[in-house]
Amino acid sequence: MTITIDAVILAGGMARRMGGNDKGLVELESQPMIKHAIDRINPQVKEILINANRNQKVYSEFGFEVISDQDSGYLGPLAGMITAMSHTQADYLMVVPCDCPLLPRDLVNRMLAQLTTADAELAVASDGKREQPVVMLLKPSLRASMKAFLDAGERKIDFWYAKHNYIVTDFSDQPNAFINVNTPEQKQQLSEAIANEKNNLRCK
């Protein structure tokens, strides 16, 4: 039986540390941040959902379904995940943020292989030093558990998944994979990392 996997790109936050700018639409290397994430994740999944709570018309121009949180109170990544789980019929949902332009090209395969081998409910990515809670492969059937957690006033993703049978997938071989953008300095760091990756590809 073929396993189906959809992805949701989370672009629904308020981006306070970026001065309120919509992070998914911030330009990086001549294209919006979310376009980098789309290019990385699209070959790895069946369908893409974009979770956005503003600029929905702009996001729709990327050619994928745009979904907004069912609660308009900017309740964080969990709210976006809950919404996405109600919009997918796939066996698994791959969750990624809009501001990680160097996501691994083998992200889904590695996480799925480890998840199924361990017979776990979800897999969380790690850069080898820390877990990345918003880079997660999970079963949509976990929606009820996540919604109950959020409805109870909880927000921390790692507190939620600690209640479940989860595994951590190590991507320490790709140290730049989960660099994201919260400050102008991090944006510069990412630009340099992207340039280095392009140079390495040319040398191969």
Curated annotation (Swiss-Prot):
One of its GO terms (molecular function) is molybdenum cofactor guanylyltransferase activity. It comes from Shewanella piezotolerans (strain WP3 / JCM 13877). Mg(2+) binds at D99. NCBIfam families: molyb_mobA. Belongs to the MobA family. Transfers a GMP moiety from GTP to Mo-molybdopterin (Mo-MPT) cofactor (Moco or molybdenum cofactor) to form Mo-molybdopterin guanine dinucleotide (Mo-MGD) cofactor. It holds the Pfam family NTP_transf_3. GO terms for cellular component: cytoplasm. CDD domains: MobA. GO terms for biological process: bis(molybdopterin guanine dinucleotide)molybdenum biosynthetic process. Keywords: Cytoplasm, GTP-binding, Magnesium, Metal-binding, Molybdenum cofactor biosynthesis, Nucleotide-binding, Transferase. The N-terminal domain determines nucleotide recognition and specific binding, while the C-terminal domain determines the specific binding to the target protein. The gene is mobA. GTP binds at L10, A11, G12, K23, N51, D69, D99. It comes from the Bacteria. Its cofactor is Mg(2+). InterPro entries: MobA-like_NTP_Trfase, Molybde_CF_guanTrfase, Nucleotide-diphossugar_trans. Monomer. It catalyses: Mo-molybdopterin + GTP + H(+) = Mo-molybdopterin guanine dinucleotide + diphosphate. Its EC number is 2.7.7.77. This is Molybdenum cofactor guanylyltransferase. It is found in: Cytoplasm.
